[in-house]
Amino acid sequence: MTKIYFVQFIILFCTVISSDKVNPLFMDSIESDNVKEVVKFLNQGVDVHAHEDYALKYSSFKCNLELVKVLISHGANIHSDRDLALHYAAQQGCFEVVKYLIKNGANVNARQNSALIRACDSHHYEMIKYLIDKGANIHAKNNFCLRNSVLHHKWEIFTYLMNNGADINADNGAALFIAASDNDISAIIMLNAYNADMCIDNCKALLSAAHLGNLDTVKYYTSHSICDTKNELKALTYAYNNNQYHVFDYLLSKSNINSKI
């Protein structure tokens, strides 16, 4: 769990335990994963919906499938706070909880497909496949999952996403731009193999590489004649203006550019 997620959840928890609407002993039993005590309180009529079904959210966050089942069987609202329980379960990698929540009606596309986004962020391949199979939008956040798989070299995920309709050129070729900016040749080769538009947005990827001094990327572009001479001349200018003289010298040595200067 990242620090930011942990801090957010602690703030929420502190808000809950200070609320007059929450039975503190019930919350203690939830926090300590004491299923027997939780059932006892529920049978005594404790409000399972207190603080927007916080008990279900907390149990989902903790990957406690048994408690999640108990709470839902006692009427917990699976859609509370825009299906936040599903978001937490996906965020924490709680695959079995995710499957149970969806089986019981959770909206897989709630919170702008946050469940899929969190699964992609943690590179949880099986969860990604499951969520997409259940209708999650593969194009969420301008194909975030595809960009993330390229950035982190998760090629199994990348291949699955491409085979299921992800847009390799989404967001003006953001995946390619990231790879070129990082001088990530293996990613560039993979994107080219899957027919990415290598010249998208006026060869932005090449110009970024020249600006940053990423010689390997510049060499890949020129050796494969990906961009026209006009854009290679632009790259030459970018390199010179940003003191990337190793890139400038390389581009200057290219006969097709030299003849145009």
From Swiss-Prot:
Keyword field: ANK repeat, Repeat
Record-linked Pfam families: Ank_2
SUPFAM superfamilies: Ankyrin repeat (SSF48403)
Xref: InterPro entries: Ankyrin_rpt, Ankyrin_rpt-contain_sf
Domain of life of the native organism: Viruses
ANK repeats: 21-50, 51-80, 81-110, 112-140, 142-170, 171-203, 231-259
UniProt keyword annotation of Repeat present: yes
PANTHER family reported for this sequence: SURFACE ANTIGEN BSPA-LIKE-RELATED (PTHR44207)
Protein name per the record: Putative ankyrin repeat protein L99
Organism: Acanthamoeba polyphaga mimivirus (APMV)
